Amino acid sequence: MEILQIAIILIVFVLLCIPIGRYMYKVSEHKKTLLDPVLDKIDGFIYKLSGIQKEEEMNWKQYIFALLMCNAVPAIIGYIILRIQAVGIFNPNHVKGMEQGLTFNTIISFLTNTNLQDYAGETGASYLSQMIVITFFMFFAAATGIAVALAFIRALSGKKKLGNFYVDLVRITTRILLPLSIIVAIFYIGQGVPQTLSANKTVTTIEGKLQNIPLGPVASLEAIKLIGTNGGGFFSANSSHPFENPTPLTNSVQIITLLLLAGSMVVCFGHMIKKKKQAVAIFAAMMVLLLAGAAICFSAEKAGNPALSRIGLSQSMGNLEGKEERFGIAGSSLFTTVTTDTSCGAVNNMHDSLTPIGGAVPLINMMLNVIFGGVGVGFMNMIMYAILTVFLCGLMVGRTPEFLNKKIEGKEIKLVAFAIIVHPFLILMSSALALTTKQGLAGISNPGFHGLTQVLYQFTSSAANNGSGFEGLIDNTMFWNVSAGVVMFLGRYLSIIILLAVASSFAAKRAVPATQGTFKTDNTIFTVTLIVIIVIIGALTFLPAVALGPISEYLTL
């Protein structure tokens, strides 16, 4: 029954990707849709109000400049709001302003689509901050990621201009993110998720004691949290909290929605380059890696804790520590896998309580950072590996490698190599810094191998813009707030800049006709080769660190 539950969720996800991906293609290419009569007027009003010239096209440098400037302004405004949130506007619970280190971490976290939270949502942010800062950035960061991916695909398809960042940002928000979020938020409200501006309720329990029940505009935040692969929760318990994820049905919907746009982006890619088989090959590689991770995580958690088994305690129900009974092993394991496949970072169970092998799965997913990934940017990472795969295969047969009818030359490979190196460099160097400084070691709550995994997970999550964590880490300190913030920032924007440079280099090349000697990239052989290359590079890069963490912990149980 548990396997059937997982299968149904993933089948629904795949089926929904087809129409949503086609719709995203129409939005990106300004094709007609049913919503145009209404949304054209809304978009036009926004263009006039903000002075956007919608006909103006940008090259890759202009696109990046617009992106960076457009990200900088709300970051400054958001920082100010979090610092002064103690004022009485939409703050019925009298939440105090955040201190500077935590504010820096929070702004960078939500700006970069990471949503790493070193604060408790119900006590650390006012309603004003939750709506104006947190929810706004969830839309803004997701729209930015999708816009970059669309510009990336346009360049790969041979267009010299990448579009207009401001126009892309508006259209993605009004035509994709807002409609989906409204539908999902209404569903959540129907399932019992709160949506109110009332203050917290104090109730008398059956034991006769008083308990404070936190409330707030939860449903609206929860919808975009998953749709935009954001992951930050209204409550500190995130999607394990009954007010965020009350039923097995909402849990299934959350899994589907956090995968939906990331998977639909691949379908959109196939339409935009007019090569649907190419999209199928990429999608298949992602699904194989997803299924492998889900199978390993589920098996490890279902087997339970071997240390408890050896002392005679039954493990027939599996490892239920840190999990919600309403979701069970299947719902928790699948959520754990896909939330780190997609760089979402929402959690419906305590990752710190996973078995060593079960906990290694989300860690490795984020280290690879290619399995669907966050909305937009994760897809670009997979294309980066596809380019590298074609290049290596070309070397083996002695031919000039080609991808999408464009020759892959030294410039592209140097940029791709740099982009691949950035991710592990940020993870391993920052982890080494934390493990060799007094401030870093002070945050580790568990000694030995598990403590090392906590540190490794924190920086892997930050570099991958995921945001989930082994919450045993004491991370609300100046050291952890600043170091994680810097890693999140570099992990987001360095990748975007490098990969747009790669795409623009492809756009400048002439298309070459395919010949009998051309390595086909739209078949099973390519999919298998792509998976092997990803696994080999990931193992060569991260295996020593993983061996010192979860693998060593498993061997010592």
From Swiss-Prot:
Keywords: Cell membrane, Ion transport, Membrane, Potassium, Potassium transport, Transmembrane, Transmembrane helix, Transport. One of its GO terms (molecular function) is potassium ion binding. This is Potassium-transporting ATPase potassium-binding subunit. It comes from Clostridium acetobutylicum (strain ATCC 824 / DSM 792 / JCM 1419 / IAM 19013 / LMG 5710 / NBRC 13948 / NRRL B-527 / VKM B-1787 / 2291 / W). Induction: By low potassium concentration. It is found in: Cell membrane. InterPro entries: KdpA (IPR004623). Belongs to the KdpA family. It is a multi-pass membrane protein. Part of the high-affinity ATP-driven potassium transport (or Kdp) system, which catalyzes the hydrolysis of ATP coupled with the electrogenic transport of potassium into the cytoplasm. This subunit binds the extracellular potassium ions and delivers the ions to the membrane domain of KdpB through an intramembrane tunnel. The system is composed of three essential subunits: KdpA, KdpB and KdpC. GO terms for cellular component: plasma membrane. The chain crosses the membrane at residues 1-21, 62-82, 132-152, 176-196, 253-273, 279-299, 371-391, 415-435, 482-502, 528-548.
